[in-house]
Each structure stands twice: as structure tokens, then as C-alpha cells.
Amino acid sequence: MQATLIVVTYNGRALLAQCLPAVVEAARRAGGHPVVVADDGSDDGSAELVRASFPDVRWLGLPHRGFGETANAAVAAAETEAAVLLNSDVLVAPDFLPPLLELLLAQDVFAVGPKFLNPAGSLTDALGNRTSCRWHRGLLEIHHETRPERLRDPCAQLYANGGAMAFRREKWLVLGGFDPLYRPFYWEDVDLGYRAWGRGWQVLYQPASQVRHDQGSTMRRTQRLSYVELMSAKNALLFAWKNLLDPALLRRTLAAQARWAADDVLIGTPPPRTRALLAALRQLPEAARGRAREQLERVRSDHEILAACGASP
């Protein structure tokens, strides 16, 4: 199976200089897979670096539209059966690719995620491993497995982390890729995995493939922490409104949101979660359209999706 390795970047010249040698070498060792840098409107000399230092890497320069839409354009432009999406702050192991592609050979598999390690090579604070979700005070929260004994074998997971994921292009295109509802960033990969499960496909975790990820380093360089947290909270709400088709689960979520909105009114000054709610409400019509599409196309219930990937309903 041939795969296009796509590195998405935005003003990440220094990160590209660190990550691309490993990506190019991994692609070569796995049999010669194409490598593409999909650029989200950088103006820091990234193009000059890639063209001068990595002549075999294709440069795909795009207008600044955010991570999700840049990834979508790059996947659409690829011509291989599979694709591998990588953040520029990810360092891949030399042999990371074959184990991912091996699991993709099954026709019902949409995506496969590797084992994520921190920059020091340990599991401490590493996110993206054997993902699932849990309910906390009525709200859906993403869970990342951290116990080594539960990260030894391939298994199902809720979604493949967008920082490093392999997938079948045809299924990606059927799903429509990352939904721009979640602009500018965060939760688009959760949404994609949930929708794939809803179509009857699988998302798997493959610990035999390893990458090191400096979680959030790109965001720290380009965005304020308060803004990142606001967008993450907003998109968590939009995910629930769009994807939870089970009436009881949606009622549970809406009731929890109403409770903390009322608490915030009593406090008097809008805390981040109230600002997130107001921001999400501005996108409610867009989320409703996505929900209508899901109602037409889904073949698994919410409970079946959550059970299949080991999540708690």
C-alpha cells in the first residue's frame, strides 16, 4: 500500500528543519513513499528551506485557512491509496510507517494512530494514545490512556490524533475530511473518528509505530493560551450538538451546559466556559446542518460507537 506523508505547517521553519529528515528517511525505508509539506500560508522562509534542503519533498503552498482546511486540501491533492498526516512538531521513528499501513489493509479500517511519546521518549504527559471518552458532570471529556500495560497491543480507539495518523484516502473523502465547523483548531480529529465509527468503520491504535510529539508546541508559538482554551471549549460543545444523536445523551449534555451557564450568571463575570458557549451558539446553524447529515448517514448508534472503542456511555 502506497501512502503520501503530509506534514502540515504554519510558520514552522525551525520545526520543519528538525522533523523532515526523519520523515524523509522513514518514507525511504518503507519503500519510497511521497512526502508533501502542506503550508498554511507561512511567511517565515519555510518554502525556501524545503526547496533548498529537501528537493525530493513536494511543497504545497496554500492560503492561510487553518490546520483542518490545509490538511483537507493536501489529502485531496494526493494520489495514493493511503495518507499519513503529521504535525511539524512530530519526530517519527525510522520504522514508524509499516506497522500503520499493515493495520490499514483491513477494508473496514479507516484510520490508525501510533504510540505517542513525549520529546524525552516517555509516556509522561503524552496525549493521543488509545483515545476514548468519559462523562464528567454530564459533559463528554476525551481520555488518553497513560498506563503502559494498556498500551502494548493494537486495539480500537475513539479517534486517531491529528498530530500523527494514517488513513485510507477514499474513506477520508467520503467523510469530507476535517469539518471546518471546528475552525480554527481542536476537536476536528475527534469528530472525524466519531463519524468514521458511525459509518461502520474502525479506528485503531498501533503501539508498534512510535512518534515523539512536543504536544502543543505549534500552538504555543502562534496562539495565546487563553485563546486556545476558549476554542477547545467551544468546539467540545459543537461536537456534542452535532454528533450526539441519542436523545438521552444529548439531554444529559444540554442539562449540564445549562447548569454551569446558570452558575456563571450568579458569579457575575463571564468566565471562559460562558464565552465558549456564546461562541458556539453563533455556529449553531452550522452544527445543526452537520447533525442532519449524520442522521442520514450513520449506521451505528452513539451507544454502539462508544462501546466499540471502549468509551464510557
Task: List PLM regions with ranges.
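Short aromatic/hydrophobic "clamp" motif used to bind/position activated sugar donors
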Residues: 83
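Conserved donor NDP-sugar-binding/catalytic core segment of glycosyltransferases
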Residues: 91-131
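A short, conserved alpha-helix in the catalytic core of glycosyltransferases
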Residues: 158-176, 181-210
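Non-catalytic, C-terminal membrane-associated alpha-helical segments of glycosyltransferases
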Residues: 247-313
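Glycine-rich, basic loop-to-helix element that forms the pyrophosphate-binding segment
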Residues: 61-78, 88
